[in-house]
UniProtKB/Swiss-Prot annotation:
Compositionally biased spans, kind Basic and acidic residues: 538-548
GO BP, sorted A to Z: carbohydrate metabolic process; endoplasmic reticulum mannose trimming; endoplasmic reticulum unfolded protein response; ERAD pathway; mannoprotein catabolic process; positive regulation of retrograde protein transport, ER to cytosol; ubiquitin-dependent glycoprotein ERAD pathway; viral protein processing
Domain of life: Eukaryota
Keywords, ordered alphabetically: Endoplasmic reticulum, Glycoprotein, Signal, Unfolded protein response
InterPro entries linked: 6hp_glycosidase-like_sf (IPR012341), EDEM1/2/3 (IPR044674), Glyco_hydro_47 (IPR001382), Seven-hairpin_glycosidases (IPR036026)
Function: Involved in the endoplasmic reticulum-associated degradation (ERAD) pathway that targets misfolded glycoproteins for degradation in an N-glycan-dependent manner. May initiate ERAD by promoting the first mannose trimming step of ERAD substrates, from Man9GlcNAc2 to Man8GlcNAc2. Seems to recognize and bind to exposed hydrophobic regions in target proteins.
Signal peptide (from-to): 1-21
Gene: EDEM2
Residues glycosylated per entry: 90, 112, 289, 450
Stated name of the protein: ER degradation-enhancing alpha-mannosidase-like protein 2
Tissue and organ distribution: Expressed ubiquitously in all tissues tested with slightly higher levels detected in small intestine and peripheral blood leukocytes and weakest levels in brain and skeletal muscle.
Stored PANTHER family: ER DEGRADATION-ENHANCING ALPHA-MANNOSIDASE-LIKE PROTEIN 2 (PTHR45679:SF6)
Organism: Homo sapiens (Human)
Similarity annotation: Belongs to the glycosyl hydrolase 47 family.
Amino acid sequence: MPFRLLIPLGLLCALLPQHHGAPGPDGSAPDPAHYRERVKAMFYHAYDSYLENAFPFDELRPLTCDGHDTWGSFSLTLIDALDTLLILGNVSEFQRVVEVLQDSVDFDIDVNASVFETNIRVVGGLLSAHLLSKKAGVEVEAGWPCSGPLLRMAEEAARKLLPAFQTPTGMPYGTVNLLHGVNPGETPVTCTAGIGTFIVEFATLSSLTGDPVFEDVARVALMRLWESRSDIGLVGNHIDVLTGKWVAQDAGIGAGVDSYFEYLVKGAILLQDKKLMAMFLEYNKAIRNYTRFDDWYLWVQMYKGTVSMPVFQSLEAYWPGLQSLIGDIDNAMRTFLNYYTVWKQFGGLPEFYNIPQGYTVEKREGYPLRPELIESAMYLYRATGDPTLLELGRDAVESIEKISKVECGFATIKDLRDHKLDNRMESFFLAETVKYLYLLFDPTNFIHNNGSTFDAVITPYGECILGAGGYIFNTEAHPIDPAALHCCQRLKEEQWEVEDLMREFYSLKRSRSKFQKNTVSSGPWEPPARPGTLFSPENHDQARERKPAKQKVPLLSCPSQPFTSKLALLGQVFLDSS
């Protein structure tokens, strides 16, 4: 791949105009080194608590110190946290977890899984870890990055999702059974983000494997949404994937829509696709014209542009970061500062904030340790160097430690008004929140490489450049090296015979007898002592005694609340009267 292709990708933030803000209230910005170490300690407190109390379940329940499956029974937190380990510099634990995942994760299971969440967390997490494996000192196989065990796992998981795309419109169902495909009677109503958030992972997968089917279905889904926009250029919140009719016609940048816009921009940068960027810029005009008020973004009726809900949702806080990626720094900073005032008011971002009233919305007062405002701070700090952005990072560390930290990890904040906690630690806390905090305070991290160093890699298809920077984060904060997409370009029939044999060999399942979740008699899991974690010999015996037993609990299948519940909270819903 020509090195010049990395310039618009890797140096995008570095080339943006520089803005220099005022110092903090004490006359100086927070000390990055101090907060970097505190963020690292936060990560290991949460990570070790998961290993000791919850693995191999999906997530940790920090108040009861046990685990439960949520999105699909994949040991999800371990997959989501894997690339964060390397960003924090823990190569030995990264190497160990790669082996654990190969032995313990199975996608041939009778589970109804969210297509959206499985893609961004599992497929995205495995692809990122695969591309970072060599940097982490993993002994990669011949042909890497065009082959490898984590790539095969990512491909297997993605193939389990493909039946969801077999609809008349090409827009996917929201849920698929990993063993049987789409269940009879599955609801055809899917949120916009659940349709338009595949191009980053699926295009990467197609480029690495040589199978175009993944990128093809992702592009079709993107185009169908584009073709379904209203005459004033807006898209709604939920659509029927069988008929293509909008069911919920609320238009905005937040929950149910957010990552669709994000993936148009990131897909355009990753693939250097002018058409995707042009689509986003057209949406951006409509968003500014109809939803933006005093640097806030409201919800409006997608056909009329009339306000349906004057609230700020915490998920919308990704928007300033997205604006920074297209160079719109001034608008990004103004919106960011609006959101930061809400953080200062509550010590976190409530799920819903009523803008005219200046307070939380009933039943949406919680803060599940979401990353979006921190993500925007990280992007904007890279572009501006404004110390105000470090102050947000400082405030986030202080708030989360003070309110959310418990003996077993960090608990979701159920209510920011009285600091009541909920018994859940979502995997994105380790995948996104902690990662973006660390990168905010670590300006020399390899993720921020400006192209001054790189690795030349020989593949079966020629030489390519990797590790030069310009990483594209998927919406779960899993970094993808865009140069990798140019390492494996070939036609399917041109693949080396040895690679075909390798795939055939690895299609045989590795033994998983050591890591069964459905039986207690399989024996305890005993993580070895490792540098950089808080797991000590003294608590090995305690971990053995607390080995969680498999519980029969329903899995989650939607990115947030059930469809009907969500619409009731969103306010007025506009149904098609035809």
